[in-house]
Amino acid sequence: MVEVVRNKRPPRGLVPRLRRALAALMEELGVGDKGVTVILTGDRRLRALKREWWGEDEATDVLSFPHYEPGDPFVPPHLGDIWISLDTARRQAEARGASLEEEVLVLAAHGLWHLLGHDHQKEEDWEGFRRVQERILAL
């Protein structure tokens, strides 16, 4: 199940597509029976969260907060929360020549991949992120 919380108004049609595409991606990744919450908000909130949890005083596009430790034998019914800044997503979409809807889908897939225990500390770690980010756009 994909729950979407709107702290900032998204474009019309984004929320239903986000729910459908993220749920389909979760199914493909074998976690279709789990839940996630996506919070659509702005730069100010993401900056505050990043400062509180990472000690970095800057806005960002997406943050993931898992509700379990990846690698634990028990994966709870709710994987965690994905926070997306619509402000940063809009700027990134414009820079890439993409729509805001596409950028939010890419960020949601990126956040989900983090919730599943993946990181991108090294260049070779990015392959999985690229794969899920491309896949969600096709769903």
Curated annotation (Swiss-Prot):
Molecular function terms, GO-annotated: metalloendopeptidase activity; RNA endonuclease activity; zinc ion binding
Protein EC: 3.1.-.-
Pfam name, any one: YbeY
Main localization, broad class: cytoplasm
Keywords of this entry: Cytoplasm, Endonuclease, Hydrolase, Metal-binding, Nuclease, Ribosome biogenesis, rRNA processing, Zinc
GO annotation, biological process: rRNA processing
Domain of life: Bacteria
Free-text cofactor note: Binds 1 zinc ion.
SUPFAM superfamilies assigned: Metalloproteases ('zincins'), catalytic domain
Required cofactor(s): Zn(2+)
NCBIfam families reported for this sequence: rRNA maturation RNase YbeY
Known function: Single strand-specific metallo-endoribonuclease involved in late-stage 70S ribosome quality control and in maturation of the 3' terminus of the 16S rRNA.
Identification of the protein by name: Endoribonuclease YbeY
